[in-house]
């Protein structure tokens, strides 16, 4: 018999999985229908679709880990499985980073020649960002494949220390490279982009308040809404990365009480941020409402 807290954890994991699959599925389906209708896809829609697909697979993996932890199933640590897990995790992280860069380039105002060039070219750069991410992540996986003991993604190596046999001990050089390549580089790019965006939106909000003080202007709350959306993105992204780093620095047995909690927290990001994206995008929000109404009518 499962203990009560494990039953609650399993129910939360199922809800999280269904929510993440639904929200990311809505993004993929809506943009896919637009692609079929118009035979082209906007750069932002392309980036969101790729991000949503990677998050669906990431959500599947997180649910799989939840099942392992709850039911104490032995984790099969073969190089093929670990390479896939590493690829999905790193690709999602990079695509989310480029989404932050895209928002920054489109919305922020920075009087610098490089930023002005990026602002003009960002739409054309989106496909290259996606291809570059695929290439970078593939190279990371190739590097890991040369070290049998390092095939597990950095944030998962210590999860199943009692279940897995690590053939080699991590050297400091490998640990540093893994941390920099898998976390630090995309995290720094993301933080620079969103900080520029937050400062720009904050400055714009203050200017609007000073200009239209005491009057009601349509769309006045749009910058504040965008700022809150970006802040929630930052909090989810940063907490997701920090928890992975924290778990990488400690060893947990699968029966540890704190491990299921951290896995649930990690799963909030790919589902929670996609929900925020839908609520902040008029096209996605309308189609999500239509889908829910259609589902109710069919019952």
From Swiss-Prot:
Pfam families the UniProt entry points to: TAS2R
Transmembrane region(s): 10-30, 56-76, 82-102, 125-145, 179-199, 223-243, 258-278
Keyword flag Magnesium: no
Record InterPro entries: TAS2R
Extracellular domain ranges by topology: 1-9, 77-81, 146-178, 244-257
Residues bearing glycans: 163
Cytoplasmic side: 31-55, 103-124, 200-222, 279-299
Location(s) in or outside the cell: Membrane
GO annotation, cellular component aspect: plasma membrane
Keyword Glycoprotein recorded: yes
GO molecular function annotation: bitter taste receptor activity; G protein-coupled receptor activity
Gene3D superfamilies: Rhodopsin 7-helix transmembrane proteins
Function: Receptor that may play a role in the perception of bitterness and is gustducin-linked. May play a role in sensing the chemical composition of the gastrointestinal content. The activity of this receptor may stimulate alpha gustducin, mediate PLC-beta-2 activation and lead to the gating of TRPM5.
Protein name per its UniProtKB record: Taste receptor type 2 member 1
Originating species: Pongo pygmaeus
């Amino acid at each position: 018999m499962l203990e009560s807290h494990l039953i609650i954890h399993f129910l939360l994991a199922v809800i999280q999985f269904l929510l993440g699959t639904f929200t990311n599925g809505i993004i993929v389906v809506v943009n896919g229908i637009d692609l079929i209708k118009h035979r082209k896809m906007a750069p932002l829609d392309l980036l969101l679709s790729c991000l949503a697909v990677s998050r669906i697979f990431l959500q599947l993996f997180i649910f799989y880990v939840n099942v392992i932890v709850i039911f104490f199933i032995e984790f099969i640590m073969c190089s093929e499985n670990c390479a896939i897990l590493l690829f999905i995790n790193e690709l999602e992280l990079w695509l989310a980073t480029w989404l932050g860069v895209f928002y920054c380039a489109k919305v922020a105002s920075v009087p610098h020649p490089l930023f002005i060039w990026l602002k003009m070219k960002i739409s054309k750069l989106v496909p290259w960002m996606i291809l570059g991410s695929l290439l970078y992540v593939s190279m990371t996986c190739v590097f890991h494949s040369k070290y049998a003991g390092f095939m597990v993604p950095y944030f998962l190596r210590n999860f199943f220390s009692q279940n897995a046999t690590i053939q080699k001990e991590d050297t400091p050089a490998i640990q540093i490279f893994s941390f920099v390549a898998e976390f630090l580089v995309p995290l720094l790019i993301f933080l620079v982009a969103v900080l520029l965006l937050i400062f720009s939106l904050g400055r714009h909000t203050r200017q609007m308040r000073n200009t239209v003080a005491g009057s009601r202007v349509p769309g006045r709350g749009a910058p504040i809404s965008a700022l809150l959306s970006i802040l929630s993105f930052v909090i989810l992204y940063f907490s997701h990365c920090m928890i992975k780093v924290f778990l990488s620095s400690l060893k947990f047995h699968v029966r540890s009480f704190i491990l299921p909690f951290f896995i649930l927290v990690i799963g909030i990001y790919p589902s929670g941020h996609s929900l925020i994206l839908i609520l902040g995008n008029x096209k996605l929000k309308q189609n999500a409402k239509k889908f829910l109404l259609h589902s109710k009518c069919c019952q």
